[in-house]
Each structure stands twice: as structure tokens, then as C-alpha cells.
From Swiss-Prot:
<protein>
    <recommendedName>
        <fullName>Uncharacterized 22.9 kDa protein in nqo2 3'region</fullName>
    </recommendedName>
</protein>
<comment type="function">
    <text>URF2 product may be involved in the transfer of iron-sulfur clusters to the NADH dehydrogenase complex. It may also be required for the assembly of the NADH dehydrogenase complex.</text>
</comment>
Amino acid sequence: MERAECNRNCWISAAIAGVVVLLFTAGIGDLHWLAGLFLGVVTFVLFGALMVWLVCHERPELFEEGAGLTGTDWQRAAVDRQPETLLVGGSLGPEPFTSEAQMPIVAGAMPAEPLVEHRPEPKPAAAAKVARGADDLKRIKGIGPKISDWLNAQGVTRYDQIAAWDPATVDDFAQRLGRMGGRIEADDWVGQAKLLAAGGETGHSRRVDKGEVG
């Protein structure tokens, strides 16, 4: 919501209140409509100024992150400002191997040369991903600073990781996030992450880059 829209809504409410006062007071006293009109104008001015001061000027936080948002976007931005309850349980990713394959050793049949364990060399693409720094996950709409920090703590630091989530992974993260988990599908984190990982931009990511959204 923009400040101008907030001011306009306050003055509209004040105008309605002034009309109501005019209708109820027009028949009182000797002046009738003139007295009602005077009281209606006074109500409009005082009530409107009070509403603008209380609603629009005394609550600047309404305009810091919600500029340009309407409808469901404004409701989601309001949810972002509420304290987040993160339900964290378990660990992410595949479980580490607890044992390694052992080669049976038979007495009297020791090999002439020492055994050398051969490990597969990492693929260049995988090595490049590890070397790359973490992405700014707040450029994905629906991920605020607290959720971004939590995802980083769980090992999710890049767009391509979120872009690779399948439905089962989405459900797992949604359960861990608790009431905030619905944002994953509502804001299409996976679709946004695919676009950002490919070097594209969204309207939200551009606002983050400009510093309009924290």
C-alpha cells in the first residue's frame, strides 16, 4: 500500500462520517441544514486529519516493504512481518554412510602390492557448484531474512538447490517451516529459483537489488 492510497482511504472514511453527521443533525435547532452542514464539515476535517495521522503517519512500517503490493501480495507481505515459528526437526540430505565395503582377507593370500582405494573423481560441474558462493535467497518472493537464515543453516544456500526440489522435498520443507510452509507453493519458490539460477530476474528480485525490499 502506498502512502497516497492510505491518505485517500482515510479522507473517504472521514467524508462518509461527515455525511452521517449532516443527516443526523440537520433537523436540530433553528438553522436546520446550515447547522448540520457546519457540523458535517467539522467532522470531516477533524476525523480525516486524525485518521491520516494515526493510520498513515504513525505506522511507517506499513509502507517500507509493501510499496506497490495489492490484494494477496499485500496480505503475504503482512504475514512476513509477523514473528515466524520454525519447526525444525531431523536433518536434510541423504544420511552419511556408516560403514564401508570391506574386502575379505584370506590367510596366506596377501596381495603382492598394497591395495589402493580408488575414489571417483568429482565431476567438473559439481566442483563448480561447490566453489560458487551462496546466493541471496531473499531475492525469492516469500523468503524473508529469518527464513533465509534458517535455510542457510539447513545447507540451502543457492537458487539451483531450491530449483531442484521435487514435490516430496517441498512437502518436507513445508512441514519444517510450520505455518510459513504454505509460502513455498503459494509464491512458487521452485519456479522463481529456476529463473534466478538461469540468470533471469523477477519483479521482486529487482526491488531487492534496488534496496526497496529488505
